């Protein structure tokens, strides 16, 4: 039987301390203001913000950002944009994360926009997805449109951009904190700029905002001689713990982490290194525990099409990429569900992902799931679990590298911090 432990006051440790600190800060601020009413205007001029710009300290109920897991009732979400999406240059880290049959595509179109007609269809699909989310009672927010074709240069590399299609890759909400991930692809170095207006708004309304150490993305971060030839090579390398990213500096994509209350699960992948995982462990302890899990996966990148937690003690586990630690979950009383084989046809382009985007679903709450309208077999699987399916077709959007979970970051879910993994 699954054991659940509710933590009083919501998020214990870090968030409780934050709230107590806020109350103490207010009291101290009041005393100081009374003591300094006669102070000079020159001292006031040294304040970093004017009176109308002061950032408020919210109560837990007022904070616009709060999510503890992947299944509590969804109230607000960021949905990405396909507009202006560009093919990333064919660098070593891109090669390691893509399938060989698409390498000629990257070699030909790297630095250019994705096929225009395909992107237009993806844009229309995501707009419809947003409309359906709003119909389901969810507030939808979007990143800013950006011209990703512009070339940029740092002291260590030059590149063009990619897109702001997958907010799950760059933003992770833990409690009332937004964490910006230090992603590993050079083409995504400035992706955060599309989200900054939203993040600043949430911050001004009381959310906590953390940017993980920005990687230099110097050559030392990548194994320039990473030996990629066949899928068998990839299996061997992954089994040996060898990846295209080194331990030169911390890097991670937020989509390699998945939340279950006080327990957060992560994989070491082509874009997430152990330094990045350790940074998250130190940053989130002691309230949260980070568990490293691994899979029989020749191309590990993002956990949510391999291991997707859809409810308290309920997880979808990809049969093609079995979890090496699955007994750990069974012993904790979890139910492990094997999703059916995807139905997406072989001739549909998936430039950055596999067909298993069928299991990359978005839970609207414990009893509602957003699922691909074309994937009838997984719809039946959810219905057998007593979960209502909200069907949307995003096949052309899938081609850009993500399913519903990838295309979103949940900003606010109604619930409390609990332990599901005792």
From Swiss-Prot:
UniProt GO MF annotations: glycine amidinotransferase activity
Keyword Cell wall biogenesis/degradation: no
GO cellular component: mitochondrial inner membrane; mitochondrial intermembrane space
Organ and tissue specificity: Strongly expressed in neurons and glia of the brain, the lamina propria, submucosa and serosa of the small intestine, in oocytes and on the fringes of the pancreas. Not expressed in the retina, eye lens, heart or bulbus arteriosus. Expressed in the yolk syncytial layer in gastrula stage embryos, in the yolk syncytial layer and mature somites in early segmentation embryos and in the yolk syncytial layer and the liver of long-pec stage (48 hours post-fertilization) embryos.
Family annotation (CDD domains): amidinotransferase_AGAT-like
InterPro entries given in the database record: AmidinoTrfase
Subcellular location as annotated: Mitochondrion inner membrane
Keywords: Membrane, Mitochondrion, Mitochondrion inner membrane, Transferase, Transit peptide
Example GO BP: creatine biosynthetic process
Pathway noted in the entry: Amine and polyamine biosynthesis; creatine biosynthesis; creatine from L-arginine and glycine: step 1/2
Superkingdom: Eukaryota
Catalysed conversion reaction: L-arginine + glycine = guanidinoacetate + L-ornithine
EC code: 2.1.4.1
Residues forming the catalytic site: 253, 302, 406
Function of the molecule: Catalyzes the biosynthesis of guanidinoacetate, the immediate precursor of creatine. Creatine plays a vital role in energy metabolism in muscle tissues. May play a role in embryonic and central nervous system development.
Quaternary structure (record): Homodimer.
Family stated for the protein in its record: Belongs to the amidinotransferase family.
Name recorded for this polypeptide: Glycine amidinotransferase, mitochondrial
Source organism: Danio rerio
Gene name, Swiss-Prot/TrEMBL: gatm
